[in-house]
C-alpha cells in the first residue's frame, strides 16, 4: 500500500470561526496553527498546504497568564544604528490586538514559504463581527 500524498488541486478548504473571549493566547494559537496547517485532517501532507481558513473574533479580549502583559516584550530592528524597537504585550494588546495573536500563530507555523500561504488564511478581528458570513463558518471549540 502506497502512502497517500495530497495534491494542491484536490484540497478542500473549510472555514472555522473561533471566539477567543477570555481564552489563553498560547493555547488558542496552537489550535489555530494546527488547523491552518491541516494537521487535523487525515490527508495532511507536510509539503502541501492542506489547511483550512480560520476567522478569529474578539481578539481584544484574549487572556495572557501571569505577568506576561507587562513582562513579555516583542522586539524589532530597522537595521539602522539605534533602530531597536520594543513593545510589551500589554501595549500591543491595547494598540493592535490582532497583531498579538498573529505573532503568536506565526511563531508556531513552519519557517518556510508555505507558512506565508497558511498565514494568509488567518482572518483576525478585534470585535465580535466579521465580514465572512457568506462562507458559513463552523464553530471551532477550543
Curated annotation (Swiss-Prot):
Domain of life: Bacteria
InterPro entries reported in the protein's UniProt record: Ribosomal_uL13, Ribosomal_uL13_bac-type, Ribosomal_uL13_sf
Keywords assigned: Ribonucleoprotein, Ribosomal protein
Matches recorded under SUPFAM superfamilies: Ribosomal protein L13
GO CC term (a single one): cytosolic large ribosomal subunit
GO biological process, one term: translation
Any GO molecular function: structural constituent of ribosome
Similarity field: Belongs to the universal ribosomal protein uL13 family.
HAMAP family with a match to the protein in the record: Ribosomal_uL13 (MF_01366)
Protein name (database record): Large ribosomal subunit protein uL13
Organism field: Geobacter sp. (strain M21)
Higher taxonomy: Bacteria, Pseudomonadati, Thermodesulfobacteriota, Desulfuromonadia, Geobacterales
Annotated gene: rplM
Amino acid at each position: 500500500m502506497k502512502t497517500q500524498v495530497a495534491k494542491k488541486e484536490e484540497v478542500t478548504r473549510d472555514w472555522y470561526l473561533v471566539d477567543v473571549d477570555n481564552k489563553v493566547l498560547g493555547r488558542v494559537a496552537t489550535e489555530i496553527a494546527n488547523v491552518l496547517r491541516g494537521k487535523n485532517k487525515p490527508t495532511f501532507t507536510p509539503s502541501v498546504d492542506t489547511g483550512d481558513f480560520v476567522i478569529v473574533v474578539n481578539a481584544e479580549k484574549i487572556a495572557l497568564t501571569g505577568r506576561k502583559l507587562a513582562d513579555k516584550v516583542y522586539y524589532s530592528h530597522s537595521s539602522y544604528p539605534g533602530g531597536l524597537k520594543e513593545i510589551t504585550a500589554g501595549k500591543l494588546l491595547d494598540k493592535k490586538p490582532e497583531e498579538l495573536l498573529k505573532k503568536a500563530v506565526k511563531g508556531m507555523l513552519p519557517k518556510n514559504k508555505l507558512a506565508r500561504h497558511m498565514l494568509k488564511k488567518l482572518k483576525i478581528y478585534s470585535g465580535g463581527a466579521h465580514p465572512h458570513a457568506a462562507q458559513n463558518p463552523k464553530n471551532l471549540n477550543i
